[in-house]
Structures are given as C-alpha cells and as structure tokens.
Regions:
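C-terminal end-of-chain micro-motif
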Residues: 1, 37, 242-245
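Conserved beta-strand-loop-alpha-helix hinge in the C-terminal portion
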Residues: 221-245
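ABC family nucleotide-binding domain
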Residues: 3-217
C-alpha cells in the first residue's frame, strides 16, 4: 500500500500580540492507505492541532503535507476546503449535528457542496451510508430524538457520505457511556475491515489498542510510534444490538 498521508518536518505556531506559541515541532509521519491509527497523549500535547492540519482545517507554519500525492501545505483556505469536502470525513466528540435538520438531511449536507449531484442521488447515498451504520430506520428523526450513541453513528454516516480517503475522529467516544462507546468502536472496527483509513484521537488506552498503530505525542512532538501486534480483536458485529442504542 502507498502512503496516503505524509508529513515532512511539520511545525505549527500561533501568534497572540506578536508572542509565538509553537504547538507542533518537526512532525514526520506517514499513514498508509487502509491503516487504522490512534493518536494519543495528554491534554494540550498537540493532538487536536495535528488532526486539524491533517483535516485541512488549518495550514502548517513550516514543512510539507502530502495528501494523495499532492502537496497541500501552501493551499488557500478555499482550495483546502475543496479538497477537504471530497477526501476527508470528520467525526467529532460532540457529534455536531444540526438540530433543525433530520438525520437524512444532516448526512446529505456534505454532498450539497458538490456540483452536479441531484437531490435524489444525495438521498440515495445518505440511505446507503445510514444502512451501513444501522440508522436507516431513523432518517426522518431529528437529533434531539436520538440517544448519544445514535447521534454519533449519524455523524459517522455523514463522514462516510463522500467516500473519503480518510476518516479523522477526534475523541469520538468522549461524550458516550461505555455501552455506546463500545458500539461506536465496533463500528470503526467494521469500517476498517472494509478498507477504511482511520486516524482517531483518544485518551483511552483500550481504545488505542483497537488500532493497528498507536502514535504518542508529548509537548507538540511525536515521541512514540508503536505497532499494536497484540491489538484487541474487533468485537463481533452482532455482539451489540446497535438499534437498541
């Protein structure tokens, strides 16, 4: 497999009243297509900043970011947004569903920014990914009518709807109880087994062990890169009744 993502000496600084705060220091990293990677470390170590750069929500101060063989380091905000909408799927800790849109409408939202796709095609694609996360029976419901676990599965469907090259998940189980967290992690196992590339930020060591590879950050630096040769085996997909969550 070829490298889907390659970071070369990536640094990121923020400036407040001309005072520089360096959040990332010389990150070198390669993620191969089809890998499941966990990004770990204490709060404030730079995990979310790195994920923002990977997701093209921000640009590095220094270094090169190669995504799908394209150097995206120096692109404008609009250029980054265009690539992001096609190649990257996000799953956030707080779900980030729009309260006055239905489940189906929330999932279709990323498709609405693409030209040349009809509403009928958007509906069909939304139905397809909602079936994948076992939420197709809730298409007409609103977020307030769903449990936390159900909302996060809708958020995963939204991340999948564009057939992204990579799924970036920032503490996807952070707002969930243990049962719902396990259901979401099991869903990630399933998606990875189907070929998805996933990079997940997590504080939970057990969650990190489900990934093939664990990256550890400390003070803005990548200090560990471990292959999880004895990673936890994925829970059987029928071991949890997702519809009950």
């Amino acid at each position: 497999m070829s490298a889907l993502i390659r970071l070369e000496n990536i640094s990121k600084s923020f400036y407040t009243d001309e005072i520089e705060t360096q959040a990332l220091h010389g990150i070198n990293l390669s993620i191969t297509e089809g890998e499941y990677v966990a990004l770990t470390g204490q709060s404030g170590c730079g995990k979310s900043t790195l994920l923002s750069l990977l997701g093209l929500l921000d640009a590095p101060t220094q270094g090169h970011y190669i995504l799908s063989n394209q150097d995206v380091s120096g692109l404008s905000r609009d250029q980054r947004a265009a690539i992001r909408s096609k190649q990257i799927g996000f799953v956030f800790q707080s779900f980030n569903l729009i309260s006055d849109l239905t489940v189906a409408e929330n999932v279709m939202l990323p498709l609405s920014y693409q030209s040349g796709i009809s509403r009928k095609e958007m509906q069909a694609k939304a139905q397809e990914v909602l079936e994948k996360v076992e939420m197709s029976h809730r298409t007409a419901h609103f977020p307030s009518q769903l449990s936390g676990g159900q909302q996060q599965r809708v958020a995963v469907a939204r991340a999948l709807v564009n057939d992204p090259a990579i799924i970036l998940a920032d503490e996807p189980t952070g707002n969930l109880d243990s049962k719902n967290a396990m259901a979401v992690l099991t869903l990630f196992d399933k998606l990875h087994s189907e070929g998805a590339t996933i990079c997940m930020v997590t504080h939970d060591p057990a969650s990190a062990l489900r990934a093939q590879r664990s990256l550890e950050m400390f003070d803005g630096r990548l200090v560990g890169d471990t292959r999880n040769t004895q990673a936890s085996q994925p829970v059987a997909h029928n071991a949890l009744d997702l519809e009950a969550l």
